[in-house]
Structure formats: structure tokens, C-alpha cells
Amino acid sequence: MTGRRIALLSFGALLAGALGMSGPAPAQCRLCATPSTQTITSADSDNMRIEIEARLDFDQLVVRDNSPGSVQLQPDGSSTISGSVGAISGRAMVGTAMVHGEPGRFVRVDMPTAITLHGIRGGTIRLDSLVTDLQSAPRLDSEGMLQFRFGGALHIESNADGDFRGDIPITVDYL
Amino acid sequence: MTKFVKIAAVAAALLGTAPAFAATSVTGAAPSATARIIRPLTLTATGSLNFGTIVMNNVTANRTVTVNPDGSITCAVELVCDTTGSFVTYNVTGTNGQTVNIIKNTSTLTGSNSGSLTLTPVGANSVVLTNSGAPGKDFPIGGSIDIAPTTIDGVYTGTVDVQVDYN
């Protein structure tokens, strides 16, 4: 009887411990069908980072009049202009980012679909159709790196002129 | 005994469940997107560049006469010049806050009795626009010419060549 009670208490303690676990608790799996001695750590996010190598820069745009206009800069560097935009500078550059992480890992890259650029002297203009040159299933290479470029479409309303700037947050997740 | 075994199996299943870690995610420092929107420059001029009368007094070498952007005249030796001349006032319009470069090119003045003089515009190298469109920004331009011992007397006329461009 005593032996049976001790066994039940032991299992009770184990159950309480299991139910009391909060959050991801790194531990060896001892009772799995295929026990693993590899420690699962939370260092995945510690070894992944993003470097912005170049910002998306439309450089200088000449607008002919006060009517609306737009310019689109594709990740491959090609551009199209329309409306009041008369010319785009040859120094316009697409944005470039480099992801560093675990070799071979698949990742998902998220960017907003649109942002607002604010003028130094006031006013705003819209940047949308943000797009990258990533493949459908981006993956870090054998050195744990993945470089991609991004572009977008700038929409200029009437009377907008001067220097404008905005921030594009980019988030990367392991899959 | 059977009951004991079942409880053990449930406990094992609970302990053996792999912990569900949150997907790792990093957000890099937001790259900026920038653009400079500018309006076309316009350039207009009022007034004329006038050196007045220059008397050559036994000129023995090339001598320079300058109409300064404030209209005063700098006269070299062996020449007799008027005290003041007139300068050209240019007006440039474009985008507020932008720096505009002033490109001053030489041009040729043609004499009424043949001969020619080279005119070099004189003035600031750039201006900063303080508004978009009208009223724009005014800037004065003078000029300088070299009088050589062989310069033929007469009335010399021509155009002032000044251009503007965004920096």
C-alpha cells in the first residue's frame, strides 16, 4: 500500500510540474519516443539580423506643374514616370537589405504595403506598391545570408516640393 | 495495476510534448526612403551690363576693367573709366530651400569698328532659394573685359551668358 501511494505521489508531482511549466522551457526530452540530447535554445533570434545596405532613394524628381504625378522604381532598377513628373535623376537607387542567420533556413520577409514620406518643410507624399525581388520561398544561403532589393511607387500631389523622408520597417521571421 | 499504468502513460505524454517556442522574428533598423521633388528653374533678367566709357591712355599691356555686382567700376592703370556702370539683375525661381548654381560663361562683344572683346560675367557662384515659384530670388551680375594695346576703339556690344542649375 505504501509503495503504491509513493508511486501515485511521484506521478502526481510529475504532473504538477508539467502543468506548472510556463513558457518555453529548454530541457532535454527524456520520455520521447526518440529521445534527443540536443538542447533547444532560444538563440534563434540572437543570430539573425538585418543590415540595410542602401536606402530607397528616388533622388531628384522634376515636376512640371501642379498636377499629380508618380514615379515607380522597381527592384531591378528600372523606373517609370507619369503625370507631372518630368524626369527622374540617374542617381535614383533601389533599397538593398541583407539578412544574416542560420544557413539554409527558410525565412519570411514582411514590409508594409505603403508608407508616408514627410517633408522637411511640411507636407507629405505617399509611397506604396512596396515590392522586393525575393523568390516565393526565400532561404538563407550556405553562409546564412540573403540579400534582396526593394522598390516602390511614389505619388506626388499638387504643390508638393522639397525634401521628403520616411521609414520602411522590415521584419524577417524564420519559418 | 492497470490504472497505475494509464496514469503513467498520461504523465509521459505530458512530459514528452515538445514545448511550443514562439517563431523567431527580427526587425531591422527601418531603412529610409527619400525623395527630392523640385520644380523647373526659370531665369529672367532685367537691366543691362554697361561699362560706360573707357579711355585708353597709352596702354602697354592687357588691362582689366570690371563692373562689380554693385555697379562700381574697378579700373586698371593706363585706362580712364567712369566711376560707376550698370549691372544685370537676374531672377531665378524654383523650389524653396534648394541651392542653385550660377554658371557664368564667357561671351564675345563685337566692336562697331571691328575687333572683339571677351566678356567674363562676375558675381556669386550660387544662391539659395527662399521660396517656391514666385517671387524667386534676385542676384546681380557684373562683368570684366580685358583691354589690350591693340584693342580697336568703338562701341562693343554682345550678350551676357549666365545659366542656372540645381546643385
Q: For each predicted feature, which ranges?
A:
Chain B
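N-terminal small/polar-rich segments of proteins
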Residues: A23-I102, L129-N167
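Short acidic, flexible loop segments centered on an aromatic residue
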Residues: I102-L109
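Bacterial N-terminal signal peptides that target proteins for export
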Residues: M1-A9
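Short beta-strand and strand-turn-strand segments in soluble, beta-rich domains
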Residues: N113-N125
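A short local loop/turn or secondary-structure capping micro-motif enriched for an aromatic residue
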Residues: G52-T53, L109-S112
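N-terminal signal peptide c-region/cleavage motif recognized by signal peptidases
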Residues: T17-A18
